[in-house]
Amino acid sequence: MKIGVFHRSLNPMGGAEHVCLAVIEALKELNCEVTLVTMEPTDWSRVCKLNPKIMKPDKEISILKIPMKFLSTYLKFYACHMFGMLRRNFDLSINTHGDILPAPADIVFMYYPVIFESKPLPEKYYKSLLWKIYYQPYLLLKSMFPINFKWKLLLTFSEFGKNAIKKHLSSEAIIFNQPVDIDEFSKASFNNCRLNRVVLCGRYSPEKNYEFAVEVARHLPYIEFIIIGSISNKGYESYYNKIAHLVKEYDLKNVKLLTNVSRETQIDIYSKSKVFMHTAVNEPFGIAVVEGMAAGLVPVVHKSGGPWLDIVKQGEYGLGFGSVDEAVESINIAIKNYPSLKIKAIERAKTFSKQKFIEAFKSLVLNLI
Protein backbone atom coordinates (compact mmCIF):
# COMPACT_ATOMS: atom_id res chain seq x y z
CA MET A 1 0.00 0.00 0.00
CA LYS A 2 1.28 3.47 -0.94
CA ILE A 3 0.90 6.05 1.82
CA GLY A 4 1.73 9.76 1.72
CA VAL A 5 2.70 11.56 4.94
CA PHE A 6 2.58 15.36 4.83
CA HIS A 7 4.60 17.47 7.31
CA ARG A 8 5.83 21.05 7.16
CA SER A 9 9.45 20.19 7.97
CA LEU A 10 11.28 17.64 10.09
CA ASN A 11 14.21 19.97 10.68
CA PRO A 12 12.94 21.66 13.90
CA MET A 13 12.71 18.19 15.56
CA GLY A 14 10.09 19.22 18.10
CA GLY A 15 7.09 17.23 19.34
CA ALA A 16 5.23 17.34 16.02
CA GLU A 17 8.28 15.95 14.23
CA HIS A 18 8.49 13.04 16.67
CA VAL A 19 4.85 12.26 15.89
CA CYS A 20 5.61 12.27 12.17
CA LEU A 21 8.57 9.92 12.63
CA ALA A 22 6.51 7.57 14.83
CA VAL A 23 3.79 7.50 12.15
CA ILE A 24 6.40 6.58 9.53
CA GLU A 25 7.74 3.82 11.79
CA ALA A 26 4.26 2.39 12.34
CA LEU A 27 3.54 2.39 8.60
CA LYS A 28 6.87 0.71 7.82
CA GLU A 29 6.01 -2.03 10.34
CA LEU A 30 2.86 -2.59 8.27
CA ASN A 31 5.09 -3.01 5.18
CA CYS A 32 3.63 0.08 3.54
CA GLU A 33 5.50 2.12 0.94
CA VAL A 34 5.85 5.49 2.66
CA THR A 35 6.45 8.80 0.90
CA LEU A 36 7.20 11.81 3.10
CA VAL A 37 6.08 15.12 1.60
CA THR A 38 7.66 18.21 3.18
CA MET A 39 7.90 21.89 2.39
CA GLU A 40 11.69 21.91 2.54
CA PRO A 41 14.39 19.22 2.21
CA THR A 42 15.04 17.24 5.39
CA ASP A 43 18.48 17.61 6.94
CA TRP A 44 18.78 13.93 7.79
CA SER A 45 22.21 14.32 9.40
CA ARG A 46 20.70 16.76 11.90
CA VAL A 47 17.56 14.66 12.45
CA CYS A 48 19.57 11.49 13.05
CA LYS A 49 21.91 13.30 15.44
CA LEU A 50 18.97 14.42 17.57
CA ASN A 51 17.20 11.06 17.32
CA PRO A 52 19.47 8.24 16.10
CA LYS A 53 16.81 5.49 16.28
CA ILE A 54 14.55 6.59 13.45
CA MET A 55 13.06 4.77 10.49
CA LYS A 56 13.31 6.75 7.25
CA PRO A 57 10.54 6.84 4.63
CA ASP A 58 10.99 5.03 1.32
CA LYS A 59 10.81 8.31 -0.58
CA GLU A 60 10.80 12.01 0.15
CA ILE A 61 9.26 14.79 -1.91
CA SER A 62 10.23 18.36 -1.03
CA ILE A 63 7.77 20.85 -2.46
CA LEU A 64 10.43 23.54 -2.18
CA LYS A 65 13.88 22.51 -3.33
CA ILE A 66 15.65 24.86 -0.93
CA PRO A 67 15.21 25.63 2.81
CA MET A 68 12.33 27.97 3.69
CA LYS A 69 13.54 31.48 4.44
CA PHE A 70 11.10 33.94 2.95
CA LEU A 71 7.32 34.16 2.48
CA SER A 72 6.77 31.02 4.58
CA THR A 73 3.39 32.48 5.63
CA TYR A 74 2.17 32.10 2.04
CA LEU A 75 4.21 29.08 1.04
CA LYS A 76 2.30 26.83 3.43
CA PHE A 77 -0.89 27.43 1.44
CA TYR A 78 0.94 26.58 -1.77
CA ALA A 79 2.27 23.44 -0.08
CA CYS A 80 -1.25 22.46 0.98
CA HIS A 81 -2.44 22.85 -2.60
CA MET A 82 0.45 20.72 -3.89
CA PHE A 83 -0.18 17.98 -1.33
CA GLY A 84 -3.82 17.99 -2.40
CA MET A 85 -2.61 17.22 -5.91
CA LEU A 86 -0.05 14.63 -4.78
CA ARG A 87 -2.42 12.71 -2.49
CA ARG A 88 -4.13 11.27 -5.56
CA ASN A 89 -1.04 9.09 -6.00
CA PHE A 90 -1.48 7.43 -2.60
CA ASP A 91 -3.87 4.81 -1.27
CA LEU A 92 -3.94 6.64 2.07
CA SER A 93 -2.91 10.19 2.99
CA ILE A 94 -1.84 11.46 6.43
CA ASN A 95 -1.30 15.07 7.50
CA THR A 96 0.81 15.10 10.68
CA HIS A 97 0.92 18.90 10.93
CA GLY A 98 -2.73 19.92 10.72
CA ASP A 99 -2.17 22.74 13.24
CA ILE A 100 -0.69 25.02 10.60
CA LEU A 101 -1.13 23.11 7.33
CA PRO A 102 -4.84 22.89 6.44
CA ALA A 103 -4.29 20.21 3.82
CA PRO A 104 -7.07 17.62 3.42
CA ALA A 105 -6.07 14.03 4.17
CA ASP A 106 -7.60 10.75 5.28
CA ILE A 107 -5.99 11.14 8.72
CA VAL A 108 -5.13 14.53 10.21
CA PHE A 109 -3.13 15.12 13.41
CA MET A 110 -3.78 18.43 15.13
CA TYR A 111 -2.36 19.52 18.49
CA TYR A 112 -4.27 22.77 18.46
CA PRO A 113 -6.11 24.63 15.64
CA VAL A 114 -3.50 27.39 15.48
CA ILE A 115 -4.27 28.54 11.96
CA PHE A 116 -8.00 28.85 12.67
CA GLU A 117 -7.68 30.70 15.97
CA SER A 118 -8.60 34.39 15.96
CA LYS A 119 -5.82 36.38 17.58
CA PRO A 120 -4.99 40.11 17.65
CA LEU A 121 -2.59 40.96 14.85
CA PRO A 122 1.02 41.69 15.78
CA GLU A 123 1.60 45.43 15.96
CA LYS A 124 3.68 45.58 12.79
CA TYR A 125 0.74 44.33 10.69
CA TYR A 126 -1.52 47.29 11.45
CA LYS A 127 1.04 50.06 11.98
CA SER A 128 3.00 49.59 8.77
CA LEU A 129 1.34 50.05 5.37
CA LEU A 130 3.84 47.67 3.78
CA TRP A 131 3.04 44.90 6.28
CA LYS A 132 -0.69 45.55 5.81
CA ILE A 133 -0.34 44.99 2.07
CA TYR A 134 1.68 41.83 2.72
CA TYR A 135 -0.75 40.39 5.27
CA GLN A 136 -4.22 41.07 3.82
CA PRO A 137 -4.08 38.33 1.14
CA TYR A 138 -3.04 35.88 3.87
CA LEU A 139 -6.19 36.65 5.87
CA LEU A 140 -8.28 35.97 2.75
CA LEU A 141 -6.53 32.64 2.12
CA LYS A 142 -6.88 31.72 5.77
CA SER A 143 -10.65 32.27 5.62
CA MET A 144 -10.99 30.12 2.49
CA PHE A 145 -9.03 27.04 3.51
CA PRO A 146 -11.38 25.61 6.18
CA ILE A 147 -13.95 25.03 3.41
CA ASN A 148 -11.70 22.41 1.79
CA PHE A 149 -10.01 21.08 4.93
CA LYS A 150 -11.54 17.61 5.14
CA TRP A 151 -10.58 14.33 6.79
CA LYS A 152 -11.88 10.89 7.69
CA LEU A 153 -10.21 10.88 11.11
CA LEU A 154 -9.05 13.86 13.16
CA LEU A 155 -6.60 13.05 15.96
CA THR A 156 -5.28 15.19 18.80
CA PHE A 157 -3.19 14.61 21.94
CA SER A 158 -4.99 16.22 24.86
CA GLU A 159 -8.31 17.30 26.29
CA PHE A 160 -6.99 20.83 25.91
CA GLY A 161 -6.54 20.31 22.15
CA LYS A 162 -9.84 18.45 21.78
CA ASN A 163 -11.77 21.31 23.41
CA ALA A 164 -10.04 23.93 21.26
CA ILE A 165 -10.81 21.98 18.07
CA LYS A 166 -14.44 21.71 19.11
CA LYS A 167 -14.55 25.47 19.72
CA HIS A 168 -12.80 26.66 16.55
CA LEU A 169 -13.72 23.94 14.03
CA SER A 170 -16.95 22.53 15.50
CA SER A 171 -15.41 19.08 15.03
CA GLU A 172 -14.88 16.10 17.30
CA ALA A 173 -11.31 14.84 17.56
CA ILE A 174 -10.08 11.51 18.91
CA ILE A 175 -7.45 11.76 21.66
CA PHE A 176 -4.29 9.77 20.94
CA ASN A 177 -1.45 9.46 23.45
CA GLN A 178 1.69 11.25 22.28
CA PRO A 179 4.56 8.93 21.23
CA VAL A 180 7.47 9.31 23.64
CA ASP A 181 10.63 7.22 23.55
CA ILE A 182 10.19 6.15 27.17
CA ASP A 183 12.72 3.30 27.00
CA GLU A 184 15.55 5.57 25.94
CA PHE A 185 14.89 8.26 28.56
CA SER A 186 14.08 5.81 31.35
CA LYS A 187 17.73 4.70 31.34
CA ALA A 188 18.48 7.98 33.11
CA SER A 189 15.90 7.34 35.83
CA PHE A 190 18.06 4.77 37.65
CA ASN A 191 20.66 7.33 38.71
CA ASN A 192 19.94 8.65 42.21
CA CYS A 193 23.08 10.78 42.54
CA ARG A 194 21.73 14.08 41.18
CA LEU A 195 22.41 17.79 41.42
CA ASN A 196 19.91 20.40 42.56
CA ARG A 197 19.47 21.33 38.93
CA VAL A 198 16.56 22.46 36.73
CA VAL A 199 16.41 21.53 33.04
CA LEU A 200 14.32 23.04 30.24
CA CYS A 201 14.21 21.61 26.73
CA GLY A 202 12.69 22.72 23.43
CA ARG A 203 13.48 24.78 20.37
CA TYR A 204 14.65 28.36 20.90
CA SER A 205 11.34 29.94 19.94
CA PRO A 206 9.41 32.81 21.64
CA GLU A 207 6.42 30.64 22.57
CA LYS A 208 8.71 28.60 24.85
CA ASN A 209 8.88 31.64 27.14
CA TYR A 210 12.46 31.09 28.31
CA GLU A 211 12.57 34.70 29.59
CA PHE A 212 10.40 33.49 32.45
CA ALA A 213 12.92 30.78 33.35
CA VAL A 214 15.71 33.35 33.38
CA GLU A 215 13.67 35.47 35.80
CA VAL A 216 13.07 32.46 38.05
CA ALA A 217 16.79 31.64 37.99
CA ARG A 218 17.52 35.14 39.31
CA HIS A 219 15.57 34.22 42.45
CA LEU A 220 17.34 30.85 42.85
CA PRO A 221 21.08 31.61 42.52
CA TYR A 222 21.97 28.43 44.43
CA ILE A 223 20.27 26.19 41.82
CA GLU A 224 21.68 25.50 38.35
CA PHE A 225 19.46 25.98 35.28
CA ILE A 226 20.21 24.41 31.91
CA ILE A 227 18.22 25.23 28.76
CA ILE A 228 18.68 22.63 26.03
CA GLY A 229 17.37 24.13 22.81
CA SER A 230 17.44 23.46 19.11
CA ILE A 231 18.20 26.09 16.46
CA SER A 232 17.18 25.30 12.90
CA ASN A 233 16.58 28.75 11.38
CA LYS A 234 17.40 32.45 11.77
CA GLY A 235 14.29 33.09 13.86
CA TYR A 236 15.36 30.53 16.45
CA GLU A 237 18.89 31.93 16.42
CA SER A 238 17.55 35.44 17.06
CA TYR A 239 15.55 34.24 20.07
CA TYR A 240 18.57 32.35 21.42
CA ASN A 241 20.61 35.56 21.20
CA LYS A 242 17.87 37.40 23.10
CA ILE A 243 17.95 34.87 25.95
CA ALA A 244 21.77 34.83 25.98
CA HIS A 245 21.73 38.63 26.25
CA LEU A 246 19.39 38.45 29.26
CA VAL A 247 21.63 35.91 31.00
CA LYS A 248 24.64 38.15 30.41
CA GLU A 249 22.78 41.32 31.44
CA TYR A 250 21.75 39.76 34.76
CA ASP A 251 25.19 38.18 35.16
CA LEU A 252 23.64 34.80 35.96
CA LYS A 253 26.36 32.29 36.70
CA ASN A 254 23.76 29.59 37.37
CA VAL A 255 22.23 29.55 33.85
CA LYS A 256 23.70 27.60 30.95
CA LEU A 257 22.34 27.67 27.38
CA LEU A 258 23.03 24.67 25.14
CA THR A 259 22.20 24.32 21.44
CA ASN A 260 21.56 21.30 19.21
CA VAL A 261 23.02 18.75 21.63
CA SER A 262 22.98 15.04 20.82
CA ARG A 263 20.37 12.76 22.37
CA GLU A 264 23.17 11.06 24.33
CA THR A 265 24.25 14.36 25.91
CA GLN A 266 20.64 15.31 26.64
CA ILE A 267 19.96 12.07 28.51
CA ASP A 268 23.23 12.38 30.44
CA ILE A 269 22.19 15.85 31.65
CA TYR A 270 18.75 14.54 32.62
CA SER A 271 20.31 11.70 34.62
CA LYS A 272 22.08 14.22 36.86
CA SER A 273 19.19 16.67 37.35
CA LYS A 274 16.09 16.75 39.56
CA VAL A 275 13.55 19.12 37.99
CA PHE A 276 12.12 19.57 34.51
CA MET A 277 10.63 23.03 34.05
CA HIS A 278 8.21 23.88 31.24
CA THR A 279 7.53 27.60 30.83
CA ALA A 280 5.39 27.65 27.66
CA VAL A 281 1.87 29.00 28.16
CA ASN A 282 -1.06 27.03 26.72
CA GLU A 283 1.18 24.41 25.12
CA PRO A 284 -1.14 21.86 23.47
CA PHE A 285 0.81 18.89 24.85
CA GLY A 286 4.53 19.10 25.65
CA ILE A 287 6.40 15.92 24.69
CA ALA A 288 9.54 17.26 26.39
CA VAL A 289 7.74 17.19 29.75
CA VAL A 290 7.04 13.46 29.43
CA GLU A 291 10.63 12.77 28.33
CA GLY A 292 11.89 14.54 31.44
CA MET A 293 9.50 12.61 33.68
CA ALA A 294 10.59 9.29 32.14
CA ALA A 295 14.19 10.23 32.99
CA GLY A 296 13.25 10.75 36.64
CA LEU A 297 12.81 14.52 36.71
CA VAL A 298 9.96 16.13 38.64
CA PRO A 299 7.84 18.28 36.29
CA VAL A 300 7.19 21.92 37.20
CA VAL A 301 4.93 23.38 34.51
CA HIS A 302 2.87 26.46 33.78
CA LYS A 303 -0.71 26.02 34.94
CA SER A 304 -2.16 25.95 31.44
CA GLY A 305 -2.54 23.74 28.40
CA GLY A 306 -1.75 20.07 28.02
CA PRO A 307 1.23 19.88 30.40
CA TRP A 308 -0.90 21.01 33.34
CA LEU A 309 -4.28 19.50 32.41
CA ASP A 310 -3.30 16.26 30.67
CA ILE A 311 0.22 15.31 31.76
CA VAL A 312 0.61 16.28 35.42
CA LYS A 313 -3.18 16.24 35.93
CA GLN A 314 -3.32 19.57 37.78
CA GLY A 315 -0.75 18.65 40.39
CA GLU A 316 -1.32 14.92 40.76
CA TYR A 317 1.96 13.98 39.04
CA GLY A 318 3.96 17.17 39.38
CA LEU A 319 3.85 20.84 40.34
CA GLY A 320 2.61 23.99 38.64
CA PHE A 321 3.00 27.75 38.68
CA GLY A 322 1.29 30.89 37.50
CA SER A 323 3.86 33.44 38.65
CA VAL A 324 7.58 33.76 39.29
CA ASP A 325 7.10 33.46 43.06
CA GLU A 326 4.99 30.32 42.63
CA ALA A 327 7.58 28.82 40.28
CA VAL A 328 10.34 29.45 42.82
CA GLU A 329 8.26 27.80 45.53
CA SER A 330 7.39 24.79 43.34
CA ILE A 331 11.03 24.19 42.40
CA ASN A 332 12.06 24.26 46.05
CA ILE A 333 9.27 21.80 46.92
CA ALA A 334 10.26 19.51 44.03
CA ILE A 335 13.88 19.37 45.19
CA LYS A 336 12.97 18.91 48.86
CA ASN A 337 10.55 16.05 48.09
CA TYR A 338 12.45 14.66 45.12
CA PRO A 339 12.48 10.91 45.99
CA SER A 340 8.70 10.54 46.32
CA LEU A 341 7.80 12.90 43.47
CA LYS A 342 10.25 11.14 41.15
CA ILE A 343 8.39 7.83 41.51
CA LYS A 344 5.07 9.45 40.56
CA ALA A 345 6.61 11.15 37.52
CA ILE A 346 8.15 7.94 36.17
CA GLU A 347 4.92 5.97 36.52
CA ARG A 348 2.91 8.67 34.76
CA ALA A 349 5.38 8.87 31.87
CA LYS A 350 4.93 5.17 31.09
CA THR A 351 1.40 5.84 29.80
CA PHE A 352 2.85 7.81 26.86
CA SER A 353 5.24 5.24 25.36
CA LYS A 354 6.07 5.36 21.65
CA GLN A 355 5.39 1.64 21.27
CA LYS A 356 1.85 2.06 22.58
CA PHE A 357 1.31 4.83 20.04
CA ILE A 358 2.68 2.71 17.19
CA GLU A 359 0.50 -0.28 18.03
CA ALA A 360 -2.62 1.89 18.40
CA PHE A 361 -1.91 3.72 15.14
CA LYS A 362 -1.33 0.47 13.25
CA SER A 363 -4.72 -0.79 14.43
CA LEU A 364 -6.34 2.46 13.37
CA VAL A 365 -4.84 2.27 9.86
CA LEU A 366 -5.84 -1.38 9.42
CA ASN A 367 -9.42 -0.56 10.43
CA LEU A 368 -9.50 2.39 8.04
CA ILE A 369 -8.33 0.49 5.00
Regions found by a protein language model. Give the residues of each.
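Aromatic "clamp/platform" in nucleotide-sugar-dependent glycosyltransferases that forms part
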Residues: 281
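Short hydrophobic beta-strand element within catalytic cores of glycosyltransferases
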Residues: 298-302, 312
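A conserved mid-protein helix/loop that constitutes part of the nucleotide-sugar donor-binding site
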Residues: 18-22, 205-219, 238-239
